[in-house]
Amino acid sequence: MRVLLFLSLLFTPLSFAGHHSESKNEQIIFLLDLEVIEGKENQVDDLIDRLVDNVKKTEPGTIAYEYYASSKDRIFLYEVYENHAAAEFHVDSFLQGDLMPIFVDTFRVLTFEVLGTTTEQLKVKMKDFTQDHRPKTDGFKR
């Protein structure tokens, strides 16, 4: 009996640890390098504020949604989603939202990488913005 108790105590934390790492493997990451279209520089800050506010209020599955500027005409956008469903919800919201036309009028997408395992359905929805989908092959996170 003691052996069974010992083994159950030994393996229970391992099973939780495995489950925890699996959930992290479900994350989907979007990496976008954007160029501000000439003549649109004055609307960038307001547009970014509106986009951030909208995503923060309406997309609980978004873990990170951050803009970085290297100059007044180059922006990097970093997005992390809990899982495929959250990423697809974001894409649907963006494509159907009021801010999408302003976004494409303001930014030229130079590169757009999608990291994580995505479905064919999501790839089809994103085809006008990117076809660069990269499933994880190996690695770890602490």
PLM regions and their residue ranges:
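Hydrophobic h-region of N-terminal signal peptides that target proteins for export
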Residues: S8-F16
